[in-house]
Structure formats: structure tokens, C-alpha cells
Amino acid sequence: MSQTTPAATDRLAQLPLPPGPRVPGVVQTALFSHRDRITPWLRKHYGDVIAVSVLGRPSVLVCSPELNRSVLSGEPTTFHAGEGRIQGIRNVMGEGSVVTTDEAAHQRLRKLLVPPFNGAALRGYRDMMKELAAREIGRWPVGTPFAAQPRMNAVTLEMMLRVVLGLREGPQLDALRVPFSRLVSASMAVYAGEVVPQLQRFGPWKRFRQLRERIDDALYAEIRERRSAGTTADRGDVLSQLIATQVDGDRLSDAELRDQMVTLLLAGHETTAITLSWTLHDLAHDQALQDKAIAAVDTGDDKYFEAVIKESMRLHPVFYAVARRLTHDIELGGYRVPAGYTVFAGIGPVQSDPGQHADPHAFRPERFFDGSATAWNWLPFGAGVRRCLGGGFAMMESTAILREVLLNYRLSPGRSRPETARARHVVYIPSHGARIIAHRRAK
């Protein structure tokens, strides 16, 4: 929270800056790209508040639940989440996205986005999710190794197009399936080109701009058609509900609808696919755990089944940290962090901390029944006023897909050794795509 009184300002000015490694910024950025491996060493040497330089930004990584609470539940006028995002990704999502805006603009969008993600709306998506999951999983190869992640990418993309955008079989769906897939899989170098307009006339940056234009044209055409037809109230998809939503006479513009759709794709499609890929990988490598998960599916034990997915999210966080850009100087853990710094609330460090989770590297869903997993040491959807609105959607989607897998298959490893995490952009994925072998279950 910002400090305003003269005495508080004087006290804050006397606090030291956080400690951190004394190496060139380019080296720190390179090290931070392997933050899951370097953070334990940094914590050992510098504590839970660590100064780092990331992409030329002076930054701080915090590594305890208490400090994460200070950051994630801090005053929204001081901790800017939208401004903390990488500019290239901000440009693609749009300036009217719920994740790129801050303060009053964010609060307005959040109110308008609630209806499609409340409990009643989520229940309406269940049958479509089950149908899409069964269709994709029915095409899996049997008895031969394959990478689970591309398969999970395919089914979660189809859910985004059908459940979120509400596209039906036909030219609109065909026009967006491949472009959206390419948008998600584009390299960080291509996204970085979004902040250098001159690059967009050449090579991959030009193709990426053209790709975005095709997506935008298709989305705007779909939005205009829905508005003119006036049939959104009869459809159950997220886009139609957002078009129909009004709060105190306020509604989303076409540009804002476009920004939310692209944001939901980028923020919700690959993240769910990665979580499911890790879950399948871990079940394949632990037959006793898989037996329990299959029993939970067969007996309808939804609590244990959901705990399996939550434990996968804890053990393999897709995002290692979430960023906030400071608008005021703050005190954090006895240190002064100046305005303009980016503060990273560490999800990975807390979720793998033995002080928070007993035997943290073991896959143990039971920890979600003994009270050890809390709102501040299990953070896959963030926390505070910026907690992910789509968290319930992601959990329902994940359970629908995993349930179809385990109803139909037993899994075994596609490689002799478990896979490690590999950084791709800002997410962590299985190093070999989560290779598994599917064996049909006896009915």
C-alpha cells in the first residue's frame, strides 16, 4: 500500500533495497528464464525478497505466502497487474482486455465478465465439454507411445472455439481453428516484435501481423452477425452471454469483446492443456496413483478426482510467478521497493516449499483434504482482486477431459524416465511433450 504521511515517507526512504545477484542484467534475464532451477539458490543466499533484472526491468521476486498476500491483495492503485504484463502480449490481447487493464477500467470489465463464469453458466457447458472430450480421446492411438500435450492442445482449443466462441461446424470454425493455434504457438521473439512496428513489415513478424488481422476480421464478423441476429439469449456460449450482458446499462463494445475472446484463448487454452499433460504424465508414471484416480472416476468420487488435478497444478505450476508493476514506493519484507519496479509474486517457490507442503515433490492429492493447502500456498489461479475469473471453467474443463481419458484407458509411460519442466515463453511445459501409452480398459 502506498505511504503518504511525511513520517512514513521518511521511514520508507531509510529502508534498504532488496538484495540480489550482482551480475549484468542480460545474465539475470537469462537466469530468470530458468527460474524454477535458480530460485532455490537465490532464496538460500538472499532470502524471500530478491532483487532481479528481467528484460531490463528492475524487479523483485517474493517467495513466501505472507509476502504474496501483501502483493496480490494489495491496493490496486499501487499494484498494477495489467501494466506488469509483457508489452508484446498486451498488444495482442488488446488494451481493452480484462488482464491488460488496471484500476477502474479493470473493475468495470470484471463486472461485465462475471455472468458467463458463474455456477449456473458453468453447468451449462458440461455436456458440450464431455462430447468434445470423448470425440478427441476416441482418436488416440492405442498401445504405441505418443506425446499427450499436442493432443491436449487440440481438445482444449476445440473447447475454446465451441464453448467460448460458440462456433458451430462450418466455415467460421474452419477459418479460426488453424489461425488461433498458430497465434498460441508463436515464439516469444515474434511477440516481442509487436513493440517494434518496423519489424512488422518483414518475415515472421509480417506473417504474425497478417495472422492477427485474419483472426480479428473473423471475430468482428462473428460479433456483428450475433448482434444483428439478436439470438444471443438463445445460445449458451460465453461470447453470446457477453454480448447479451448489461450491468447498469453498460455493455461491452465490439472491440472489448474481441479483446476478451483473444485473452481467453491465450490465457486459458494452453494453460489447461499443460496441466492435463502433466497430470497424464504423472498418472502414467505412478500406477498406484492411477488406480486411485480410476477408482474415483468409476465410483463418482469427484472430490478426490478434482484433488488429483489440483495436485498436478501445485506440483507443476504453469506460471512460476505473476507480475505487478508498482505505482508507488512500498515496504516489502523490511525492504524498500521503488515505484516503477515489477514485483513477481512467486507461485512456484511457495507451492514447492517444504515449509508449506510436506514432501513437496511427491504427488499426494490427499493434502487437499488435510488443510495444508490454503488460498495463499496454492495459487494456480492467482489470488486477491485479480484472481482468474476462468478458474471454475478451467477446473470443469480439466475434469471433463481427464474423466473421459480414465473411463477409456489405462496409461503407462512413453519414456523410461519422468520428464522435467522446460520453459516456453512464460509457461513451463513437459520437456518431451508428456509421452504416454494408452491401453484400452476392459468395459
Kindly label every feature range from the protein language model.
Residues 156, 269-290, 294-296, 392-409:
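Cytochrome P450 catalytic-core helices
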Residues 3-4, 12-18, 43-44, 133, ...:
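Cytochrome P450 proximal C-terminal region
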Residues 26-47, 221, 299-333, 354:
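Conserved cytochrome P450 K-helix E-x-x-R motif and the immediately C-terminal K′/meander segment
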Residues 345-372:
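Conserved cytochrome P450 K-helix/beta-meander segment immediately N-terminal to the heme-binding cysteine loop
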Residues 2-15, 79-90, 105-108, 121-274:
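Cytochrome P450 heme-thiolate monooxygenase catalytic core
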Residues 2-95, 99-108, 123, 127-135, ...:
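N-terminal membrane-proximal hinge/A-helix region immediately C-terminal to the signal-anchor transmembrane segment
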Residues 17-20, 25, 126, 130, ...:
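Cytochrome P450 I-helix active-site segment
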